[in-house]
Each structure stands twice: as C-alpha cells, then as structure tokens.
C-alpha cells in the first residue's frame, strides 16, 4: 500500500515538474510583432512608416529602376544583353505578358499601398491619437506615400484595383478595377491631409 502511495506521489511530482518546465520554456516570440498589438507607441508607428519606404527602396522599384526611366530619353536602351532584355522591351514599347519586371513593379506598388493602409489604420486606433500631433504627422506621411504610389498606378495603367483598407486575408487582397477618377479623389484627399499635418522640412530634417 505504501508503494502505491509512493508511486502516486512520484507521478504527481513528475507531471507538476513537466508542466512547470513547459511554462518556463514557453516564450513570446521576439522576432516578429503581433499586428493587433503592434501600435502601442510613437516609435512603433514610425517603424511602420519606415516599412513603406522599405518597399519603395526595393531594387526593382525606386531603389534602382523605375518603370518610366527606361522609356525616357535619359536612359534609352539601344543594345540587348541577357540582363537587360526586359528593360530594352520597355524602352522600345515592345511589352508582353512575360515581362516579369513590370509584374515586379505592379506587386511593389500594391505592397507599399497595403503597408500604408495598415499603418494609417493602426495609427488612427492608437490611444491619444486625436490630440497627438506626432501621430498625426506620421499618419500624414503614410497618406502621402499612399497617394504617391496610387498616382504611379493610375499613370501607368489607368483604372486599377484600389482600396484604402489593409488586406487582412488572401481573399481581401483582391478587388475589381476602380475608376481612375475615384482614385484621383482619394489621392487628393490623402495629399490634402498630408499638407495640413506634415511639418515643413528644415535644415535639421533627416
């Protein structure tokens, strides 16, 4: 009988130890942020705005090329090499559906807009947003970048899919084409907000 009680005690200690060990070893991941809990400080709001610039600075975006550049007289491509065939096609207005460079530009425009949508939505939901001029300025910066990217889309492709809400799922990432005049109205609205809430640049601005 004593042996049975002893076994029960041993098993109880083992299970307790395993549970405690599991609790001790379970950590919150520090390598990524939870979107729903991310916007809790001005610093994180600024990081979100920097994420929009990260999309803009991609090699295939404004980091190196931009789609209009090869079609300008400043960088007119006359020769063909294996590395610049697709750029050459743009310069000579010989486009087709296999041009992955244009596909990359298309994706990066929407990536930047979606990041701007997430940033604007997150900032607007922050505690004290209504009275915080710093948050308003960060929102204005995101609005300007969204307008800038949307203007690129319209001047390249005319009527395109467009929305001002963040794509929270695969299904919500896609939509029908929107009339360019409607998109222009959104662009003007974003730029007006940016004009009214962004500080003027100074010699100390970075």
Regions found by a protein language model. Name each.
Residues 21-69, 94-95:
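Membrane-proximal, proline-rich intrinsically disordered regions
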Residues 36, 63-84, 165, 199-206:
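Short, surface-exposed recognition loops and adjoining beta-strand edges that mediate ligand/DNA contacts
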Residues 46, 54-60, 82-157, 172-185, ...:
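Conserved, well-structured interaction surfaces
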Residues 166-170:
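Short edge-strand/loop segments of extracellular domains
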